[in-house]
Amino acid sequence: MKAAEIREKFLKFFESKGHTIVRSSSLVPGNDPTLMFTNSGMVQFKDVFLGTDQRPYTRATTAQRSVRAGGKHNDLENVGYTARHHTFFEMLGNFSFGDYFKHDAIRFAWELLTTVYQLPKDKLWVTVYQEDDEAYDIWAKEVGVPAERIIRIGDNKGARYASDNFWTMGDTGPCGPCTEIFYDHGPDVWGGPPGSPEEDGDRYIEIWNLVFMQFNRDAQGNMTRLPKQSVDTGMGLERLAAVLQHVHSNYEIDLFQNLIKAAARVTETADLNNNSLKVIADHIRACSFLIVDGVIPGNEGRGYVLRRIVRRAIRHGYKLGRKGAFFHKLVADLVAEMGAAYPELKEAEQRVTDVLRQEEERFFETIEHGMSILEAALADVEAKGGKVLDGELAFKLHDTYGFPLDLTADVCRERGMTVDEPAFDDAMARQREQARAAGKFKATQGLEYTGAKTTFHGYEEIAFDDAKVVALYVEGSSVGEVKAGQDAVVVLDHTPFYAESGGQVGDQGVLANAATRFAVADTLKVQADVIGHHGTLEQGTLKVGDVLRAEIDAQRRARTQRNHSATHLMHKALREVLGAHVQQKGSLVDADKTRFDFAHNAPLTDDEIRRVEQIVNDEILANAPGIVRVMPYDEAVKGGAMALFGEKYGDEVRVLDLGFSRELCGGTHVQRTGDIGLFKIVVEGGVAAGIRRVEAITGDNAVRYVQELDARVNEAAAALKAQPSELTQRIAQVQEQVKSLEKELGALKSKLASSQGDELAQQAVEVGGVFVLAATLDGADAKTLRETVDKLKYKLKSAAIVLAAVEGGKVSLIAGVTPEASKKVKAGELVNFVAQQVGGKGGGRPDMAQAGGTEPANLPGALAGVKGWIEARL
């Protein structure tokens, strides 16, 4: 039975039992920044189990795409070397939300395994929690499993309820016992039943886990029965397929065998049992589906995990002798295997292929050099009888060649060696310290402050009259008084100043009273809810306890707000135009512009930029109000508010509805979209592989930009004697004229070269049967020099020639040697002889080579030495 049929039978079976088939959710957990990847079937139902979400069904079944390759759930190191470890896997599951419980869950599982899949009953063993007599009795008395094949597992992990057969969602919350079903591969395979000393063997393999959410555990560890008891089950498709296809390794099932054969094809590998092929076959699944769900290779978070997986696959291809891009070619094979079950993979095939190809090409630029250095270092360690690679070298590979530490460690592990990671960490720490010392930054997080939080009034006010100074800092130290001319950090009890956060810059402004004036140049957080005003005391003396009027630069704030609000609209517009894979990777919002980095694997076309601008400006013209609500985080994300991975959110969050955009945001914004005025994208480019950057301006800045652009268009039109509306046509005409003139010029240069060639041939000097010529050809370009050398070679028959030209303080050199003469004189060596004397270098074939230089004053002497240099070689 093939994997696709196994998946289909599972879903159809539970559908026949009243379950709703629910499509697999994304590998990027929806609106849950705390979880790296979806790693089980229950993730998309977490809120249902917690009682914060309701679905129109109480029974569900899924085939859930899952990844375990980052953080707590990380199987990456073992993938390819064991029978059942994968980065990507499919979890088959059935769920009951306050509907059926243990009896039906166990009965359904037994019926599916023994009747639908027709597994022999005497091959199935089960485990139950030590105290779960109910589950034990169901298996023994209702299902009829013999007592010797039912094993009770107690608290085997060192604490109360810490057991392989007791499941918890966390330290508190829903929990309960579970029962696991194992398949016995028979006495020919080593291993013992679960709970025995030999349980880690391969004879008894867990295939299904049935979790019974029976209790709620409070902070004191007390257990109370849940009013609605639920069921969450999970069975790995790959493990089940191995059992049904009578193989002992998941990599032997049909799905993997087809991918392994494809990997062998693209790497030109004959040995299908090579572990590297298993690694590649596994990794193409994880990488492709992560990209389908919007993850792009990068240097942090999910993107970094994806990059690690891609690079590990590439390195295994490299081990197999593949020195060029190959990994992306497997996407089509994966689509053939899994595209029917997951149409989203088929739809994204080209995008996935492009992202992987770009990442491969980028990594192959560095891997060969880095691998040669690493292999040489490992060979040196082995020659000395060592087992540890120097951490400093590992850091050099990381810092200079882009080798992640885990990649170096992976190579070492395969050689039976380890990396000195403490030394690596020391080198990394030194570099960070040097970067801090070299950089100019305001240290706020290091300030020692133990007072009350700052009350922020900046959402409603631009000034606050009775702000009290509660702390002062000069050069990082707490002081009681600041004098005129000193730079300082001022902490107030109340302030309208916004502290830099979420990509928005801090406010500027003034703190003042009748005798004192403090100019605020920036506002940063001292602690999470404590705001520091950085600046210079321009007048008077400032003491702790003084009362000031705190007033921000209102015009600067207004411009910043326009740009921040436009960023929200642009983010939404980019997702509409480019696709849901667009995710924010960074932003900077100040008074001049908004800079927005996002995941996308190709430059934006002019049409895409225009569409984004049009969508945003349409929202501006709609003049929709900005509506801010403070609500619980779970309620916000359930309502569709976009949360950003990596951002930290409290229990209460601020939700901004602005036009068609809804995001969690603590920044300051316009009252209505119309306040933005005008939106214009001015820069689009790449900042890293798979990361694009857009810069845009708004309001009066955008108006000035358009006016200046209009003025330049008018100037260009006047220079070309055309109307602005005719500019494109006129430019095309000028380009045609230039092309025609360049063609004429080329013909004249060629004619000149021909005539000069005849004259130069007469200057050739015969040395040992070879005509030697070294001369300058005034006004010639590289093409003319080459053509002239070719004609001289033809004319002189046996010759060694160097021609030079000087233009703009730079020397161009072409050397040519006829076939007979090249046996003793090489053009590359000849041109380098001259180039080294004029501050340059070059190279080429034995019969033709070129070079350049930056010291034309030395050219006459260099050419004069050619005859003697050739004489020495004939």
UniProtKB/Swiss-Prot annotation:
What the record says about family reads: Belongs to the class-II aminoacyl-tRNA synthetase family.
Please give the name of this protein: Alanine--tRNA ligase
Which gene name belongs to this protein?
alaS
Which PANTHER family has this protein been placed in? ALANINE--TRNA LIGASE, CYTOPLASMIC, ALANYL-TRNA SYNTHETASE
- UniProt-listed Pfam families: DHHA1, tRNA-synt_2c, tRNA_SAD
One BP annotation, GO:
negative regulation of DNA-templated transcription
Catalytic activity, as annotated: tRNA(Ala) + L-alanine + ATP = L-alanyl-tRNA(Ala) + AMP + diphosphate
In which organism is this protein found? Burkholderia vietnamiensis (strain G4 / LMG 22486)
Question: Which cellular compartments is it found in?
Answer: Cytoplasm
Q: What is known of its domains?
A: Consists of three domains; the N-terminal catalytic domain, the editing domain and the C-terminal C-Ala domain. The editing domain removes incorrectly charged amino acids, while the C-Ala domain, along with tRNA(Ala), serves as a bridge to cooperatively bring together the editing and aminoacylation centers thus stimulating deacylation of misacylated tRNAs.
Q: According to its UniProt entry, what is the function of this protein? A: Catalyzes the attachment of alanine to tRNA(Ala) in a two-step reaction: alanine is first activated by ATP to form Ala-AMP and then transferred to the acceptor end of tRNA(Ala). Also edits incorrectly charged Ser-tRNA(Ala) and Gly-tRNA(Ala) via its editing domain.
Q: Molecular function terms in GO for this entry? A: alanine-tRNA ligase activity; aminoacyl-tRNA deacylase activity; ATP binding; tRNA binding; zinc ion binding
Cofactor(s) recorded for this entry are: Zn(2+)
Residues binding Zn(2+) are H564, H568, C665, H669
